[in-house]
Amino acid sequence: MSVTEPPPRRRGRHSRARRFLTSLGATAALTAGMLGVPLATGTAHAEPAFNYAEALQKSMFFYEAQRSGKLPENNRVSWRGDSGLNDGADVGLDLTGGWYDAGDHVKFGFPMAFTATMLAWGAIESPEGYIRSGQMPYLKDNLRWVNDYFIKAHPSPNVLYVQVGDGDADHKWWGPAEVMPMERPSFKVDPSCPGSDVAAETAAAMAASSIVFADDDPAYAATLVQHAKQLYTFADTYRGVYSDCVPAGAFYNSWSGYQDELVWGAYWLYKATGDDSYLAKAEYEYDFLSTEQQTDLRSYRWTIAWDDKSYGTYVLLAKETGKQKYIDDANRWLDYWTVGVNGQRVPYSPGGMAVLDTWGALRYAANTAFVALVYAKVIDDPVRKQRYHDFAVRQINYALGDNPRNSSYVVGFGNNPPRNPHHRTAHGSWTDSIASPAENRHVLYGALVGGPGSPNDAYTDDRQDYVANEVATDYNAGFSSALAMLVEEYGGTPLADFPPTEEPDGPEIFVEAQINTPGTTFTEIKAMIRNQSGWPARMLDKGTFRYWFTLDEGVDPADITVSSAYNQCATPEDVHHVSGDLYYVEIDCTGEKIFPGGQSEHRREVQFRIAGGPGWDPSNDWSFQGIGNELAPAPYIVLYDDGVPVWGTAPEEGEEPGGGEGPGGGEEPGEDVTPPSAPGSPAVRDVTSTSAVLTWSASSDTGGSGVAGYDVFLRAGTGQEQKVGSTTRTSFTLTGLEPDTTYIAAVVARDNAGNVSQRSTVSFTTLAENGGGPDASCTVGYSTNDWDSGFTASIRITYHGTAPLSSWELSFTFPAGQQVTHGWNATWRQDGAAVTATPMSWNSSLAPGATVEVGFNGSWSGSNTPPTDFTLNGEPCALA
């Protein structure tokens, strides 16, 4: 789905002698009555309200989950793998690495650099918080990861690559990062089209990070400073707004321009180098920062975020120089966030959340909280010191769970946290659907969601609400830094066993199978390879699978043939002999890119027939075990990835289905006194007015004599039951039935010793005489999965004609005004209520007895009554 963000509005090594700041001309705080809302001036908790160290620990983990590129050996996120390995190839560079911005997969350099600067600032302000929480190594890993990317993105002094991936194309696909199918173009700024904002911000990030690495790795710190100097010179010399040059405007437009970054970047270079000329540059550029409309007051009714760093520079320069103009600007800004200025204050919810803007409101509150904590440490004004400190603690505690919902807004932390953030890889869909599966498959520990978008404390944990449930690297930036300062002040303990091990929620790459067409001289199987991988998501492009079978007595190996009427992989040709009477057929899907990225992309279908003439019996075939008339996991068909088994169990020599021994083992048939297991629950298909087909899963026999066959019984309504036939197969065709009549069928297994199993029964009703009849050319099964005003429809078409079709057209009419919104495996057209589906190139032909599956997403209102008037190439179809 497409997600477009609207415009937001939305102790350094070389510090000078410390000056405590006093607001000499500070105005008195506004009264609560003037504002009509409660003041955020209550005393903060003397003891920690939450385990801030745990929250910081999980926030560091979130940044690891956002990594792009080849992951390191110490990767802690079990559901993440290598991704974006071709980034930069379009421009002949290695631009791998860095962070994915949010729940999408674009690497936006502007917010990425801001995030790095804020994280580094937090470590500079409170190294003790990171050390006491045990998170300093993880912080440095994260900062090194992103700065390594900045180094790659800055191949020459006046060139900076600022974006990889196209936001519009990226947002049209919903799937995990490891299998992204779209092109990922690279975009740069240079003298011909400059970006002073992003270049100066990246300079700030590298300069601030160099301070964090200066003691441990001075050589790396020096490299960062060198790049920072070049980038700042580039930003200052060639002035321009980066979003005029790259397609980031719909996502991260530079609304505030580049003036704030010129101040911000110069300040951090001063802190990294001790060169006073950078401080002078910061102070000079400061005077050109924006002001409130029709005043000479610096802007104060917004806050520090990825776009505008002015507010951070108020505090940094006040702290560094002690000059009154910076102090006044910092006070006015933070007063607006606490007690108000000139009768105006940021809106507050009844529960105490400061709500600046709809999108990412908690992010803005957390950023402001961090800078307020920094400022509160260095000012002398006791009223403001307490006010700003307590405001900050209150906002962070609100995010952690101190709110009217008594719920955390940090994934995987605290009480009732969000479980379904708007994040493609954490969701783990394999069908390119934001709605499926219903719950996220992975826990995106530490991610701060956007939270309530209005000052009403209301929130719903809904992945499709991408305003309240968006997560992003910049959301956690000031939040992490504030947590470090609260750990330093209040303490806390990281979890000893974090992160917990995530186990897959089921088979990831597997084979399903069903009986496609029953026969007495052959076995015809429909097999479906599915790739639903998520630990991590991965491509299957060297897949093969094997179907093992036993050659029955009287069947000549030379008579065995294998064929395929419908195959999305390579056509099987040979039968392979293992030993004795054990053989297998191998289906080669090498070259087919099967990945968890869509309805069609995550699966491949193969219909194959193994024919051997009279005497053919699949009941003792290894791979036939458990296969019925509906697609279901087939654990005895073995799937390989480049020769390595990833699904299924292969037979050992001499082993037979059910665990029995091969020839020469077990008891003699006459000694068998154990009845076989009951057949699987019968299913009914191809129902007409006079016939139907029963299918069931094979019975097993542990007594040693083996299953001899099955007896089929039938009764109509309350009439008398009669035996209607016997078979050695797992299917039986019922004929001579009455139209519009309810029948009960029963299947009983018997072994070679005469033991009889329990009965398995099924009830069905034949069609009325006008319901398609025995001569219907096709059968259509139609099923839906409904939600709110939408639904997913699956259609299974079985062709019953005698001559193959080279192409086909399915037609039907919606009875209740439904609309097709997106389809797969066919080209869909709708004219009013009339719908037609025509094939893709790979499923255009239909052999007699073949089946094709198609589907679509749709919308409905009132009722979702299913269509019933299906035709195939103009001929009416029976309903399955």
From Swiss-Prot:
GO terms for molecular function: cellulase activity; cellulose binding. This is Endoglucanase E-4. Residues 771-880 form the CBM2 domain. It comes from the Bacteria. Residues 504-652 form the CBM3 domain. It catalyses: Endohydrolysis of (1->4)-beta-D-glucosidic linkages in cellulose, lichenin and cereal beta-D-glucans. Its EC number is 3.2.1.4. The active site is at 104 (nucleophile), 422, 427, 461, 470. Keywords: Carbohydrate metabolism, Cellulose degradation, Glycosidase, Hydrolase, Polysaccharide degradation, Signal. The lineage of its organism: Bacteria, Bacillati, Actinomycetota, Actinomycetes, Streptosporangiales.
